Amino acid sequence: MGPLSFHNRDFAVKSEIGTDTIRARFSGNADIDAIAPLRDLMARIHAEVVRIRAREVEIDLRELEFMNAACMKLFVNWVAEILEAPEDVRYRLRFLSNPDVRWQRRSLVALQCITTDFVVVDR
């Protein structure tokens, strides 16, 4: 796995760096054991986005079965970090979701309420 990826027993994020997009594919269960590694991974992705001046991070949650509230709060913090960044380094988070998974529908709609300029949800 590359520097923008993570894997443990129950949770994985595999990331790919494109020209102006970073794609991160989540799978498994983002539970209490995922909080610290996910926080670190988000910081590394953010730093890479700023470094390469990417315009978007695509976050594919379609294979993610569960995410606890603490992990979801990390996304709220990430959005806040984007909003506080200088305009020339702001980027969009595009979530690919599974519309059949109820927690994704509810949580991502709430996250999108923070800003529709920098959070997009594709179902």
Please report, for each region that a protein language model flagged, where it lies by residue.
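Amphipathic alpha-helical interaction surfaces in cytosolic regulatory modules
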Residues: 26-119
